[in-house]
UniProtKB/Swiss-Prot annotation:
Alphabetically ordered keywords of this record: Amino-acid biosynthesis, Cytoplasm, Glutamine amidotransferase, Histidine biosynthesis, Hydrolase, Lyase
Superkingdom of the organism of origin: Bacteria
All residue ranges annotated as the Glutamine amidotransferase type-1 domain in the record: 2-196
SUPFAM superfamilies assigned to the protein according to its UniProt record, in alphabetical order: Class I glutamine amidotransferase-like
Lineage of source species: Bacteria, Pseudomonadati, Pseudomonadota, Gammaproteobacteria, Enterobacterales
Gene name in the database record: hisH
Gene Ontology cellular component annotations, sorted alphabetically: cytoplasm
The name this protein goes by in its record: Imidazole glycerol phosphate synthase subunit HisH
A biological-process GO annotation: L-histidine biosynthetic process
The protein's role, per its UniProt record: IGPS catalyzes the conversion of PRFAR and glutamine to IGP, AICAR and glutamate. The HisH subunit catalyzes the hydrolysis of glutamine to glutamate and ammonia as part of the synthesis of IGP and AICAR. The resulting ammonia molecule is channeled to the active site of HisF.
Catalytic residues, chain numbering: 77, 178, 180
Biological pathway: Amino-acid biosynthesis; L-histidine biosynthesis; L-histidine from 5-phospho-alpha-D-ribose 1-diphosphate: step 5/9
Quaternary organization: Heterodimer of HisH and HisF.
Reactions mediated catalytically: 5-[(5-phospho-1-deoxy-D-ribulos-1-ylimino)methylamino]-1-(5-phospho-beta-D-ribosyl)imidazole-4-carboxamide + L-glutamine = D-erythro-1-(imidazol-4-yl)glycerol 3-phosphate + 5-amino-1-(5-phospho-beta-D-ribosyl)imidazole-4-carboxamide + L-glutamate + H(+); L-glutamine + H2O = L-glutamate + NH4(+)
């Protein structure tokens, strides 16, 4: 199977690459349209700011390429947020617009931001991405912005208030947490995605 990690220039790819390799795959990192469009599975990881990430997406001519993908795509952390419409970060950043939902800064409710560490995730029953993962399993988060619960939410988490922990629209999936840092539950989620 052809597994590709999109080379956005805004992610630490080694941990994602290693996590995929542990399942027996050899992922390629690429932004070449011929490689990306022929991939069986695509990963869109991201760390840092939405502005820097979108600058890289545009500079590397990935904007239209990502939106043209028809195979399963998994956005991780900031990569999930990039699927949204607009981030409140940096006075507003236009995102890919695949999911018609904004990404506001989380309300702190007296809790520290960023939301960092292990938290429980509650998936919708029957979603293939979470098959075999128990309701309330712990995943590892590091973020200050989060997509609200919306019609494309497939899993929720609570940090002062509920937010979207995972999302799906058509072939595009996103997880706000880091599956590559989330132990057995994260490994199972990656396996589910790779075997879809």
């Amino acid at each position: 199977m052809n597994v590709v990690i999109l080379g956005t220039g805004c992610a630490n790819l080694n941990s994602v690459k290693s996590a995929i390799a542990r399942h027996g795959y050899e992922p390629k990192v690429s932004r070449d349209p011929d490689v990306v469009l022929l991939a069986d599975k695509l990963f869109l990881p991201g760390v840092g700011t939405a502005q820097a990430a979108m600058d890289q997406v545009r500079e590397r001519e990935l904007f239209d390429l990502i939106k043209a993908c028809t195979q399963p795509v998994l956005g991780i952390c900031l990569g999930m947020q990039l699927l949204g419409r607009r981030s409140e970060e940096s006075n507003g950043v236009d995102l890919l617009g695949i999911i018609d939902e904004d990404v506001p800064k989380m309300t702190d409710f007296g809790l520290p931001l960023p939301h960092m560490g292990w938290n429980r995730v509650y998936p919708q029953a029957g979603n293939r991405l979470f098959q075999g993962i128990e309701d309330g399993a712990y995943f590892y988060f590091v973020h200050s912005y989060a997509m609200p619960v919306n019609p494309w939410t497939i899993a929720q988490c609570n940090y002062g208030e509920p937010f979207t922990a995972a999302v799906q629209k058509d072939n595009f999936y996103g997880v706000q947490f880091h599956p590559e840092r989330s132990g057995a539950a994260g490994a199972k989620l990656l396996k589910n995605f790779l075997e879809m």
